Structures are given as structure tokens and as C-alpha cells.
């Protein structure tokens, strides 16, 4: 791959999976292509719709939400990948994901057998670390899971 031009290397990368523009730039810089070559390659890829931050963002949201990741963490991860705020918000709205249902599924999967104050605190931290907002899961904390009627 040492004789690859910037556009060839970019196409090689994109043939494997989607990348954000920032990730592609970083990879091309690592391969020591000139700034001019990098700009031309990325412009050509975007003009031919080979690379699209919109498509990358939508796919990322779909993939990570299936792993039980909430909207706050998705926003944070996408910002680190160089995706603009307005695009993240737009794609989160277009994703048609019910965050309350997803939070409930994640919560039920991780809920401990013994439900005491320590377990509640642990679950609260877990749900926040997964990127859910308080209102997505706070109603789940008030249920008495030790009650036999719930089982």
C-alpha cells in the first residue's frame, strides 16, 4: 500500500466501513499525505457521495443504540468524531428511537435481584453512564422490585 495515492487509500478505507470526515483526515495525515492531496481526496469522496457525515452519523446512532447506548452518550461520542451539533440533533430526531423503551430494556437487563438503596444508586450511575437522561429511567427507580406481585 505504499504506492497508494490519497484517493486510493481513502477508497480502500471506505470500502471496509463508513468514516467521519475527521477520522478520514486523521488516517490520511497518519499516512503522511500532503494537505493538498488530503483536501482533494476528501472533496472528491464527498462530491461522489462516497463519504457523508450524515450517513455516518445515522449509521452510528442506529448501531450504538442497538447496543443500549442513550442519546447523551451518542452526542458525546459523535462530537469526538467531528460531527457537528446540528447534524447530531437532526439525526437523533430522525432515528425514530423511543429512548424510554430502550432505557427500560437496558434497565431490565441489568437490574439486580435484591432491590435496596445501594442497588438503586448503582443502577442510577449505570444508566447515566450509558447516556440516558434522568427522565428516561427515573420512573423505573420507584417500582418496588422486591414485591412478589411484580415477579
Swiss-Prot record:
Classification via Gene3D superfamilies: Winged helix-like DNA-binding domain superfamily/Winged helix DNA-binding domain
Subcellular location: Cytoplasm
Keyword Cytoplasm: yes
A Gene Ontology term for the protein's cellular component: cytoplasm
NCBIfam families to which the protein is assigned, alphabetical: PRK00117.3-3 (NF001057)
Family label: Belongs to the RecX family.
Role according to the record: Modulates RecA activity.
Listed name of the protein: Regulatory protein RecX
Protein species of origin: Actinobacillus pleuropneumoniae serotype 5b (strain L20)
